[in-house]
Amino acid sequence: MTTSHQPQDRYKAVWLIFFMLGLGTLLPWNFFMTATQYFTNRLDMSQNVSLVTAELSKDAQASAAPAAPLPERNSLSAIFNNVMTLCAMLPLLLFTYLNSFLHQRIPQSVRILGSLVAILLVFLITAILVKVQLDALPFFVITMIKIVLINSFGAILQGSLFGLAGLLPASYTAPIMSGQGLAGFFASVAMICAIASGSELSESAFGYFITACAVIILTIICYLGLPRLEFYRYYQQLKLEGPGEQETKLDLISKGEEPRAGKEESGVSVSNSQPTNESHSIKAILKNISVLAFSVCFIFTITIGMFPAVTVEVKSSIAGSSTWERYFIPVSCFLTFNIFDWLGRSLTAVFMWPGKDSRWLPSLVLARLVFVPLLLLCNIKPRRYLTVVFEHDAWFIFFMAAFAFSNGYLASLCMCFGPKKVKPAEAETAGAIMAFFLCLGLALGAVFSFLFRAIV
């Protein structure tokens, strides 16, 4: 079959849909992560209300005694960021691993649509609970359960999406990575707007989570339109057929008909005519992509080890009592990270260096280890062991920008190159394996975040 027979991605519709799907995979986690101020404030307020209620219930003699000062921060809010990261990343790892088996047994449309609908329901519940008063402990537990759920379904969604993108040209992994980067930027801007509105915290949070629901609904609509596009259907069928069958199949697609032989649900296939040793096949694929897989794992171990659990504890040295104090973490930590992470991911759409077989790629990945001491020596408070070396806000912003850009660019390179180091028929499995190692890095980073915070 000649290249002239290949359909074109008209108006970049498939590219844009994959961008929206990438946005949908990380939007839930980013909205929860960026809203840490809302969650910790709710925990502190609930704790204070409980203490006041306890005081009022005492007898007159006890109430006449001086009341003990209320704690500025209760134990649940103090550990919220670390526990949130752990509850997010461990389910992400587990369900990404399960997805490497589920993708051969559960239709792609069920995995993707089911995950998006489940995430939408969790956000609707979150928005409703903004209006419901809860004690600190029940609120903490319910929040962690929701984080577990959105990341479990997010793992299935992400693994399915990278496997799906592995069947298309390499440039179609880039919009997923770029969309994921924009998810963080979108969440950061939404939170800054909520703060700037001057509304009550509960009102701002309600609008914030409803906005997330609207974006997820838009993502679902985009996915439902994907199978209607000729370009997408063409690449979906390539792995099902030998070269001799592809021209006949293309003619059917161009006429809007579905090929009848070897056709399963769009995006999912298990060819009965080509039995293989699945375990041996996965080992062979892993051997081919091992450097890239371990590279993406290391990238996210360092990233999640520091962000957000450690970086949100950095305090401004110049804000004083100005409004910059309220915006310092949303802007310097979340917005800066998400802008530069998105720029790094997006750059791979037009520029890919080093190549997939270059030794420079793993070398640059290992070099990111330098960001651990650089960020730990910023103005983190409270601190017990390390001294502050980089106190000024500008140092922290500069380190966050470089930290984020290198994360987005190098991770996107690894995810783009992984499925292209194996045969086209193995690309979906390679994409799922790469997604698993990405999530392994996230889980390891969540564990290391406790260590990194403890040594400060």
From Swiss-Prot:
Regulation of its function = Transporter activity is sensitive to low concentrations of the inhibitor nitrobenzylmercaptopurine riboside (NBMPR). Inhibited by dilazep. Inhibited by dipyridamole. Inhibited by hypoxanthine. Inhibited by azidothymidine (AZT). Inhibited by dideoxycytidine (ddC). Inhibited by dideoxyinosine (ddI). Inhibited by draflazine. Inhibited by soluflazine. Inhibited by cladribine. Inhibited by capecitabine. Inhibited by clofarabine. Inhibited by ribavirin. Modestly inhibited by acyclovir. Modestly inhibited by 5-fluorouracil.
Q: Where in the cell is it found?
A: Basolateral cell membrane; Apical cell membrane; Cell membrane
* Transmembrane domains' residue ranges: 13-29, 83-107, 112-130, 139-157, 175-199, 207-227, 292-311, 324-342, 360-378, 394-413, 432-452
Stretches for region Disordered: 254-276
Single GO term (MF): nucleoside transmembrane transporter activity
Q: Give residue spans on the Cytoplasmic membrane side.
A: 2-12, 108-111, 158-174, 228-291, 343-359, 414-431
Q: Kindly indicate whether the keyword DNA-binding belongs to this entry.
A: no
Regarding tissue, the record states: Expressed in testis at the blood-testis barrier (at protein level). Detected in erythrocytes (at protein level). Expressed at relatively high levels in cerebral cortex, particularly the frontal and parietal lobes, and the thalamus and basal ganglia (at protein level). In the midbrain expressed at moderate levels, whereas in the other areas of the brainstem, namely medulla and pons, cerebellum and the hippocampus expressed at lower amounts when compared to the other brain regions (at protein level). Expressed in Langerhans cells and lymphocytes in the pancreas (at protein level).
- Impact of changing F390A on the protein? No effect on the transport activity for adenosine
Keyword terms of this UniProt record: Cell membrane, Glycoprotein, Membrane, Phosphoprotein, Transmembrane, Transmembrane helix, Transport
Tell me the outcome of changing P308A. Answer: Reduction of the transport activity for adenosine
Provide the membrane-side ranges marked Extracellular in the record.
30-82, 131-138, 200-206, 312-323, 379-393, 453-456
The entry's stated outcome for C297S is: Loss of nucleobase transport. No change in nucleobase transport
- Enzymatic reactions: adenosine(in) = adenosine(out); guanosine(in) = guanosine(out); inosine(in) = inosine(out); uridine(out) = uridine(in)
Output compositional bias ranges, type Basic and acidic residues.
254-266
PTMs per UniProt: Glycosylated.
- What happens when you mutate C222S? Loss of nucleobase transport. No change in nucleobase transport
An annotated GO cellular component of this protein is: presynapse
Consequence of substituting N288Q: No effect on glycosylation
Outcome (variant: G154S): Decreased affinity for cytidine and adenosine but not uridine. Resistance to azidothymidine (AZT), dideoxyinosine (ddI), nitrobenzylmercaptopurine riboside (NBMPR), dilazep, dipyridamole and hypoxanthine but not dideoxycytidine (ddC)
Q: Print the miscellaneous field.
A: The absence of the protein in tumor cells is associated with reduced survival in patients with gemcitabine-treated pancreas adenocarcinoma.
Q: What does this protein do?
A: Uniporter involved in the facilitative transport of nucleosides and nucleobases, and contributes to maintaining their cellular homeostasis. Functions as a Na(+)-independent transporter. Involved in the transport of nucleosides such as adenosine, guanosine, inosine, uridine, thymidine and cytidine. Also transports purine nucleobases (hypoxanthine, adenine, guanine) and pyrimidine nucleobases (thymine, uracil). Mediates basolateral nucleoside uptake into Sertoli cells, thereby regulating the transport of nucleosides in testis across the blood-testis barrier.
Per its UniProt record, what NCBIfam families does this chain match? 2a57
Q: What is known of its domains?
A: Cys-414 near TM10 is a major determinant of nucleobase transport activity.
Give the quaternary structure. Answer: Identified in a complex with STOM.
Q: What is this protein called?
A: Equilibrative nucleoside transporter 1
- Give the lineage: Eukaryota, Metazoa, Chordata, Craniata, Vertebrata
